[in-house]
UniProtKB/Swiss-Prot annotation:
Assigned EC number: 2.1.1.45
Record: residues binding dUMP: 26, 131-132, 178-181, 189, 219-221
Pathway membership, UniProt: Pyrimidine metabolism; dTTP biosynthesis
GO cellular component terms, semicolon-separated: cytosol
CDD domains linked to this entry: TS_Pyrimidine_HMase
Protein name listed in UniProt: Thymidylate synthase
Organism: Polaromonas naphthalenivorans (strain CJ2)
Summary of subunit composition and partner proteins: Homodimer.
Keywords: Cytoplasm, Methyltransferase, Nucleotide biosynthesis, Transferase
Chain's role: Catalyzes the reductive methylation of 2'-deoxyuridine-5'-monophosphate (dUMP) to 2'-deoxythymidine-5'-monophosphate (dTMP) while utilizing 5,10-methylenetetrahydrofolate (mTHF) as the methyl donor and reductant in the reaction, yielding dihydrofolate (DHF) as a by-product. This enzymatic reaction provides an intracellular de novo source of dTMP, an essential precursor for DNA biosynthesis.
Pfam families per the UniProt record, alphabetical: Thymidylat_synt
Family from the record: Belongs to the thymidylate synthase family. Bacterial-type ThyA subfamily.
């Protein structure tokens, strides 16, 4: 089957580049920004990996696996050749109670902890119609302890019932990203949560539906404008296909080698500085 060529991401990039308002920002770099945007990706049409530049799949996969360990240590990533968190890591490699800590070990007032990911899997298996299948990384009490406050802050799962007898439900995921670095960050975020949706669907014996990305402050940094212009001059290809080689015993048992991306056609990588 011929896969369609989608360009939601490039459309957002073009919108911000042409209509964004000039704003100052925390890093002192300066941005062009729009507020509020949504993209919907049908995961049955292909895996939404940006094709107008090469995206570093190893970093995306390993970062997601790191989140799922619940670790706060950058050493876990650097030991696997991933350096995307180096700019924020403290001298001892610790990053504070960032994404994985909140996902797996949200602290409660009585001294306990909540494993939000385990709760998601449990609820999807026992009560898939629930409207409370949500994971939040935005823990207000912990924000000042984090090396970087969560950009992708909250996500929710939704199961559409099977349309025929004996069929499977379809799992969709919606992410709210309060701060969206369009050039560097968003391609990673789309792919990361699309991958997580596939993994959760496999663990819960569901088919995949849509991944919906909702952005708050959607911005292009002033020192990314040349790179954005180059990328917008390229024609996108069809998205690749994802093959998960095995079904592990739990959502926490996946390994890097479990994921294979087929027919990933892409333009060359484009380097750009990260705003810290």
């Amino acid at each position: 089957m011929t896969r369609p060529i989608r360009h939601q991401y490039e459309d957002l990039m073009r919108l911000v580049a042409t209509q964004g308002a000039f704003k100052a920002d925390r890093t002192g770099t300066g941005t062009k920004s729009v507020f509020g945007h949504q993209m919907r990706f049908d995961l049955n049409e292909g895996f939404p990996l940006v094709t107008t530049k090469k995206v570093h799949l190893k970093s995306i996969i390993q970062e997601l696996l790191w989140f799922l360990t619940g670790s706060s240590s950058n050493h876990w990533l650097t030991e696997r050749g991933v350096t995307i968190w180096n700019e924020w890591a403290r001298a001892d490699g610790d990053l504070g109670p960032v994404y994985g800590v909140q996902w797996r070990s949200w602290p409660t007032p009585d001294g306990g902890h909540i494993d939000q990911i385990a709760e998601v899997i449990k609820t999807l298996k026992t009560n898939p119609d629930s409207r409370r299948i949500i994971v939040s990384a935005w823990n207000v009490a912990d924000l000042d302890k984090m090396a970087l406050m969560p950009c992708h802050a909250l996500f929710q799962f939704y199961v559409a019932p099977a349309t025929e007898a004996g069929g499977k439900g379809k799992l969709s995921c919606q992410l709210y990203q309060r701060s969206a670095d369009i050039f560097l960050g968003v391609p990673f975020n789309i792919a990361s949560y699309a991958l997580l949706t596939h993994m959760v669907a496999q663990q819960c014996d569901l088919d995949v539906g849509d991944f919906i990305w909702t952005g708050g402050d959607c911005h292009i940094y002033s020192n990314h404008q040349e790179q954005v212009a180059l990328q917008l001059g390229r024609a996108p290809f069809a998205y690749p296909l994802l093959h998960i080689r095995r079904k592990p015993d739990s959502i926490f048992d996946y390994q890097f080698e479990d994921f294979e991306f087929l027919d990933y056609q892409h333009h060359p990588a484009i380097k750009a500085p990260v705003a810290v």
